[in-house]
């Protein structure tokens, strides 16, 4: 008998369309899986069984009437940074512990229109600030491949639930690697679209010039199906770009013969584990065998400055975005004083966790009088240089290939007390956000039983190209089909 929780979107869709299974059966199987595994994995902040079963019933009625789309009846999860009308949205923070949004995020409405089934909201680093999901105010999500290890972050819950077969797909957000890094750590396909490709309306903001919403899926084909559903212009988001939405499934034929791929030397730094480099070299061999040409002598010399640029710009934007949480209109409120200023001060002191407060302070400092020109303006100038280097590279290459992370999934607690060590986890992913590029992380093997991810980077709005490369790689390998023993 078919194990329903192991199905991809495409496989589930075919069975639903042929009426061999129902959405109710598929949804119940995933809810049972969640009930079984959640005590150990802890991927979900909120599970919505009644909502899920109601939506599954509606999907089955639509299918019976011949109204079926690629995501109709497919159980999915959302990172708890996306607003869901009537369903708690916490950002894994005490500040929003009991916040129930009065509206849906744009992507939530689009998925609802497609008939997808919402299983629940996933755990994350508080306000999307972190690389391990240990910064959640509630609990730490565990890596399905080894529950002593972190799943990555900040979208760790969204990655873990797909890896653990608790959901067919999920959505996360990526500000400096928060989709791709946990995708690498959990051995799933994680995609950050071009900046402006997917509306941020209803995404609780961390850093508005860097944030982007994207999917976690079991393979590149599924990723394309989700992108077809969520991409597109939205006039409610000032950063949404009025581009024609491509058919992301177009060209997914496994053929990348003649593609020119560059390998930037700077991404193989001294802190890169040699065994990860070995796996990436193996992956490059696969791509070469598929007919792509590989140039290993690409140089992006400003790459080493990306981490410093990010940790000036992102905290600066966070300082502004998070100033709205003062305990007055919504969210946590310290009310044990009659002094308004003390109430606001205590609200923020008690409502935010240590990492969020650290980044707010860094950002406030960088924006302050006397330091704005020295730090913030200079960082913006270097950001431009990083973007220009990518643009120059893409005049020669169809895509760039790098490791997703310089390290393997690490033990829970290992880096928690060393912010710099934690920040270094994102050295391969941060430059892509700075330049607003599309990038995908796909499974590329294992080292000591722990996953390794391959990152494919594309030029702005050439999202289809990297999807084609990812799909071709997965046609030639089986790493994405491996699942953890749970």
Curated annotation (Swiss-Prot):
<feature type="active site" description="Charge relay system">
    <location>
        <position position="79"/>
    </location>
</feature>
<keyword id="KW-0436">Ligase</keyword>
<dbReference type="InterPro" id="IPR004412">
    <property type="entry name" value="GatA"/>
</dbReference>
<keyword id="KW-0067">ATP-binding</keyword>
<keyword id="KW-0648">Protein biosynthesis</keyword>
<dbReference type="InterPro" id="IPR000120">
    <property type="entry name" value="Amidase"/>
</dbReference>
<comment type="similarity">
    <text>Belongs to the amidase family. GatA subfamily.</text>
</comment>
<dbReference type="InterPro" id="IPR036928">
    <property type="entry name" value="AS_sf"/>
</dbReference>
<dbReference type="GO" id="GO:0050567">
    <property type="term" value="F:glutaminyl-tRNA synthase (glutamine-hydrolyzing) activity"/>
</dbReference>
<dbReference type="InterPro" id="IPR020556">
    <property type="entry name" value="Amidase_CS"/>
</dbReference>
<comment type="function">
    <text>Allows the formation of correctly charged Gln-tRNA(Gln) through the transamidation of misacylated Glu-tRNA(Gln) in organisms which lack glutaminyl-tRNA synthetase. The reaction takes place in the presence of glutamine and ATP through an activated gamma-phospho-Glu-tRNA(Gln).</text>
</comment>
<dbReference type="GO" id="GO:0006412">
    <property type="term" value="P:translation"/>
</dbReference>
<dbReference type="Pfam" id="PF01425">
    <property type="entry name" value="Amidase"/>
</dbReference>
<keyword id="KW-0547">Nucleotide-binding</keyword>
<protein>
    <recommendedName>
        <fullName>Glutamyl-tRNA(Gln) amidotransferase subunit A</fullName>
        <ecNumber>6.3.5.7</ecNumber>
    </recommendedName>
</protein>
<feature type="active site" description="Acyl-ester intermediate">
    <location>
        <position position="178"/>
    </location>
</feature>
<comment type="subunit">
    <text>Heterotrimer of A, B and C subunits.</text>
</comment>
<dbReference type="GO" id="GO:0030956">
    <property type="term" value="C:glutamyl-tRNA(Gln) amidotransferase complex"/>
</dbReference>
<feature type="active site" description="Charge relay system">
    <location>
        <position position="154"/>
    </location>
</feature>
<dbReference type="InterPro" id="IPR023631">
    <property type="entry name" value="Amidase_dom"/>
</dbReference>
<dbReference type="GO" id="GO:0005524">
    <property type="term" value="F:ATP binding"/>
</dbReference>
């Amino acid at each position: 008998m078919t194990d329903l929780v192991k199905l991809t979107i495409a496989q589930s869709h075919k069975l639903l369309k042929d009426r061999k299974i129902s959405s109710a059966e598929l949804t119940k199987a995933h809810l049972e899986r969640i009930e079984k595994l959640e005590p150990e994995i802890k991927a979900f902040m909120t599970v919505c069984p009644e909502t899920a079963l109601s939506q599954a019933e509606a999907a089955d009625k639509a299918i019976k009437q011949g109204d079926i789309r690629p995501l109709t009846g497919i159980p999915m999860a959302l990172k708890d940074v996306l607003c869901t009308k009537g369903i708690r949205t916490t950002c894994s923070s005490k500040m929003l512990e009991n916040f129930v949004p009065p509206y849906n995020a744009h992507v939530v409405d689009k998925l609802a229109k497609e008939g997808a089934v919402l299983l629940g909201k996933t755990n994350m680093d508080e306000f999307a600030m972190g690389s391990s999901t240990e910064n959640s105010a509630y609990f730490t999500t565990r890596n399905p491949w080894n529950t002593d290890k972190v799943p990555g972050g900040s979208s760790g819950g969204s990655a873990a639930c797909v890896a653990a077969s608790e959901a067919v797909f999920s959505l996360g957000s990526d500000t400096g690697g928060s989709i791709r890094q946990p995708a690498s750590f959990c051995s799933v396909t994680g995609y950050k679209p071009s900046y402006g490709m997917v509306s941020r309306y209803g995404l609780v903001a961390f850093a508005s010039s860097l944030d982007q919403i994207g999917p976690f899926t079991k393979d590149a084909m599924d990723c394309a199906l989700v992108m077809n559903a969520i991409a597109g212009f939205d006039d409610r988001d000032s950063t949404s770009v009025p581009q024609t939405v491509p058919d992301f499934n177009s060209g997914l034929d496994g053929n990348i013969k003649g593609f020119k791929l560059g390998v930037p030397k700077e991404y193989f730094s001294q802190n890169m584990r040699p065994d990860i480099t070995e796996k990436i070299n193996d992956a490059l061999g696969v791509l070469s065998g598929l007919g792509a040409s590989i140039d290993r002598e690409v140089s992006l010399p400003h790459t080493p400055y990306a981490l410093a640029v990010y940790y000036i710009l992102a905290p600066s934007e966070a300082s502004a975005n998070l100033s709205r949480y003062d305990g007055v209109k919504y969210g946590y409120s310290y009310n044990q004083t009659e002094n308004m200023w003390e109430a606001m001060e205590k609200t923020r002191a008690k409502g935010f966790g240590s990492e969020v407060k650290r980044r707010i302070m860094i950002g406030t400092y960088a924006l302050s009088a006397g330091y704005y020109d020295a730090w913030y303006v200079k960082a913006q100038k270097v950001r431009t240089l990083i973007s220009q280097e990518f643009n120059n590279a893409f005049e020669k290459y169809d895509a760039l290939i790098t490791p997703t992370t310089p390290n393997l999934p690490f033990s829970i607690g290992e880096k928690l007390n060393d912010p710099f060590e934690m920040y270094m986890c994102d050295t391969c992913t941060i430059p892509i956000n700075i330049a607003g590029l599309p990038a995908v992380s796909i499974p590329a093997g294992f080292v000591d039983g722990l996953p390794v991810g391959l990152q494919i980077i594309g030029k702005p709005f050439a999202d289809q190209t990297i999807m084609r490369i990812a799909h071709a790689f997965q046609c030639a390998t089986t790493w994405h089909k491996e699942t953890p023993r749970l």
